Amino acid sequence: PSGPDGMLPARYLSESLDRLGISLRRFKTGTPARVLRSSVDLNRLERQCGEEYITPYSYYTDATELNSRTQSECRIVYTNEKTHEIIRNNLGRSPIYSGRIHGTGPRYCPSIEDKVVRFADKSRHQLFLEPMGRDTEEMYLQGFSSSMPEEVQRAMLASLEGFEKAEMMRTAYA
């Protein structure tokens, strides 16, 4: 076991809190896979640019300096019937659907499995490919959180347009 983003786990924390009489609940994090930017064909994805002028949140932030920076672009990609078929064919392998994981998931960010099952009438679901930072090749595929096994996640990822050769840096987890 590990913590988020490769951090060390907080071993025995739950047991310690339980001994103190604090009731615990499990919340599912709904974290998507991370992919290597250079392995994705960005030219096949829709560009999602930021605002032309960025208004700072704080009076202490210099708006001129902030707006002189080059913004990092996001991209939009959509799931497709092949993606949905892979998910439907592997629902029994999902800890969330097999009952191995119990917990409350994020209200507005369902896993991709949940989207495919709950919104079966939709032929596609919008995903956002977001840079994790300026100095990293790591990209975050927002809207694609999953509890599927790694090999299923890899197949799901490869089914997306522009992701046929995508390298997964970190798997998604529930």
Task: Identify the function of each model-found stretch.
Residues P1-A174:
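Residues forming the flavin
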